[in-house]
């Protein structure tokens, strides 16, 4: 028994001296492993007289429990110390300012659409929308576009079949809006449109805003006044505006609108005209009673002019260095 007390004392001393979990496990193996000192004591029971084995075995098992309890307590203490040391080394100073989350911003094209909608909204224009996959009637026929017009070829238009295509303009929204209502009409139709073109000033997908006003006694002077005021509002300065005679199948007379740049050169910004009588007839409106004007503008074109961007493709390349300039 005296020998067991000595083993327990030595084991407790070794346990207290262990400064890591690895060292503590070595102490466990030394005393409780297959070849450990207390295991050897159990194995030697066979050498004792039968009447002494029971009591000796109980004493050895008690000694094992004492050592196991000491090992568990020391392991718990070492794990707590290890955790505290780790927490101390990874302490977060809560008084420091947090990492700043960078705010996003509207895309410049979205900004332009919102400016256009705001201006015309203040004049009482509603915002209308329509499908981007359009049929030939709404994209061409109802707009007085002849069957042999170049816009109807594969070179300009993305066709699914001869009667179904990606819309080439938002003019189809004008037809659908007039089909589903009665004059007077006053609305704009912003949206994505598609044409088979790609270069510095064209992309296969771009944005348009088209507008229309149909009522009794509508005239070209009203159209000129509204577009002049819009351009001055959009560029936030008094701009010189020029209307040039032009041709569009769906308006008569038609004009293209230019603004004079700071370098003295004229820059085309939109097209417009009085709604062609055939367009009104196609939706059941009497052109003898009603007249109207329509206009259309490329959103990217206006955005390029407003912000001084010289390559339209930059708007769709998602380069954050470019987009962050518009926040």
From Swiss-Prot:
One of its GO terms (biological process) is phenylalanyl-tRNA aminoacylation. It is found in: Cytoplasm. Its cofactor is Mg(2+). Keywords: Aminoacyl-tRNA synthetase, ATP-binding, Cytoplasm, Ligase, Magnesium, Metal-binding, Nucleotide-binding, Protein biosynthesis. Pfam families: Phe_tRNA-synt_N, tRNA-synt_2d. Mg(2+) binds at residue 252. PROSITE patterns: AA_TRNA_LIGASE_II. GO terms for molecular function: ATP binding; magnesium ion binding; phenylalanine-tRNA ligase activity; tRNA binding. Its EC number is 6.1.1.20. CDD domains: PheRS_alpha_core. It is an enzyme of class 6 (ligase). It catalyses: tRNA(Phe) + L-phenylalanine + ATP = L-phenylalanyl-tRNA(Phe) + AMP + diphosphate + H(+). GO terms for cellular component: cytoplasm. The keyword Glycoprotein does not apply. Binds 2 magnesium ions per tetramer. Belongs to the class-II aminoacyl-tRNA synthetase family. Phe-tRNA synthetase alpha subunit type 1 subfamily. NCBIfam families: pheS. Tetramer of two alpha and two beta subunits. This is Phenylalanine--tRNA ligase alpha subunit. It comes from Vibrio vulnificus (strain YJ016). The lineage of its organism: Bacteria, Pseudomonadati, Pseudomonadota, Gammaproteobacteria, Vibrionales.
């Amino acid at each position: 028994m005296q020998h067991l007390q000595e083993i327990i004392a030595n084991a407790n001393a070794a346990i207290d001296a262990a400064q890591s979990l690895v060292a503590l496990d070595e102490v466990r193996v030394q005393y409780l492993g297959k070849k450990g000192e207390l295991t050897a004591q159990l194995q030697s029971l066979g050498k004792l007289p039968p009447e002494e084995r029971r009591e000796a075995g109980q004493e050895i098992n008690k000694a094992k429990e004492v050592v196991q309890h000491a090992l568990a307590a020391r392991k718990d203490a070492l794990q707590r110390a290890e955790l505290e040391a780790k927490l101390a080394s990874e302490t977060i100073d809560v008084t420091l300012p947090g990492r700043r989350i960078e705010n996003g911003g509207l895309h410049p094209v979205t900004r332009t659409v919102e400016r256009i909608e705001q201006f015309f909204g203040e004049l009482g224009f509603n915002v209308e929308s329509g499908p981007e996959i359009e049929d030939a009637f709404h994209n061409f026929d109802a707009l007085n576009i002849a069957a042999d017009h170049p816009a109807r070829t594969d070179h300009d238009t993305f066709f699914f079949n001869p009667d179904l295509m990606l819309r080439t303009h938002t003019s189809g929204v004008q037809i659908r809006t007039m089909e589903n209502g009665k004059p007077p009409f006053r609305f704009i139709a912003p949206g994505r449109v598609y044409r088979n073109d790609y270069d510095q000033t064209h992309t296969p997908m771009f944005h348009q805003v088209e507008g229309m006003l149909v009522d009794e006694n509508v005239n070209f002077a009203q159209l000129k006044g509204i577009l002049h005021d819009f351009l001055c509002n959009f560029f936030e300065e008094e701009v010189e505006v020029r209307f040039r005679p032009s041709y569009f199948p769906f308006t008569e007379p038609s004009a293209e609108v230019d603004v004079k740049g700071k370098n003295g050169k004229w820059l085309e910004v939109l097209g417009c005209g009085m709604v062609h009588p055939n367009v009104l007839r196609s939706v059941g409106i009497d052109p003898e009673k009603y007249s109207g004007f329509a206009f259309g503008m490329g959103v990217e074109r206006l955005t390029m002019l407003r912000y001084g961007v010289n390559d339209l493709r930059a708007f769709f390349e998602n380069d954050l260095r470019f987009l962050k300039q518009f926040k």
